[in-house]
A protein has these predicted regions:
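Short, well-structured N-terminal submotif of metal-dependent ribonuclease cores
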Residues: 1-56
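Short secondary-structure boundary segments
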Residues: 8, 58, 129-131
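Short catalytic/ligand-binding loop motif for oxyanion handling, primarily in non-cytosolic enzymes
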Residues: 12-14, 63-65, 134-137
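Short, flexible/disordered intra-domain loops and linkers
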Residues: 18-28, 104-105, 136-144
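PIN-domain endoribonuclease scaffold, especially VapC-family toxins
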Residues: 42-101
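A short acidic, often aromatic-flanked loop/helix-cap motif at beta-alpha or helix-coil junctions
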Residues: 62-63, 99-106, 165-171
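Active-site neighborhoods of divalent-metal-dependent phosphate/nucleic-acid chemistry enzymes
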Residues: 88-126, 131-139
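Acidic, PIN/NYN-like endoribonuclease modules and their adjacent C-terminal/linker elements
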Residues: 132-179
Length: 179
């Protein structure tokens, strides 16, 4: 089973692409973006390399709800429907966590919470478009600049991956493992 922690920027990008795609008057609508592809894999619980389980926390869901309402200017009903759908995806793999360890040195508390959630949930991959924000100097080994790194801790090791690279790996059926 592939255990994915999807950063909030991926959920937001997928929602925006979907909303643009359904606006008949907007010709800039996008479909089949990397973010949409990843969200669809989580929704279906399956990928070209096997089953998919979502790792997410209640704190991440609360933050996503706030971003949808305050920054995307969408109404509460849309935000709640989106959050409820994500909660259901997480229940498929029973990986809704309460939080993390509190000992990782990241500048941004939201990014810290996401990384801690990925570790607490034993994610194989943390997928984020904000790659550089998750690099912890002494604990992270960069494999491909701005695209792929391995985070090591005593509790768990995981791969931090840009969505484009993650989608490329999934479509090829070749997912690297931590050596």
């Amino acid at each position: 089973m592939l255990r994915l922690c999807i950063d909030l920027n991926i959920w937001v990008a997928a929602l925006l692409a979907e909303r643009l795609a359904v606006c008949a008057s907007n010709r800039k609508g996008r479909s089949n973006t990397a973010s949409q592809y990843l969200v669809e894999l989580v929704r279906s619980g399956a990928s070209p390399v096997g089953e998919v389980s979502l790792i997410i926390s209640l704190g991440m869901l609360d933050e996503l709800r706030s971003v949808i309402i305050e920054h995307l200017d969408l109404n509460l009903d849309i935000a709640d429907a989106y959050i409820s759908a994500i909660e259901e995806y997480a229940k498929l793999g029973v990986q809704l966590t309460l939080g993390g360890t509190g000992v990782i040195a990241l500048r941004d508390t939201e990014d810290l919470h996401v990384l801690e959630t990925a570790i607490a949930g034993k994610a194989d991959f943390l997928v984020t478009a904000n790659f550089k924000d998750f690099l912890v100097r002494r604990d992270t080994q960069v494999k491909i600049v701005n695209r792929h790194a391995i985070y090591h801790s005593s509790a768990h090791s995981l791969q931090i991956v840009h969505p484009y690279l993650m989608v490329e790996w999934l479509r090829s059926g070749k997912i690297p493992t931590i050596a």
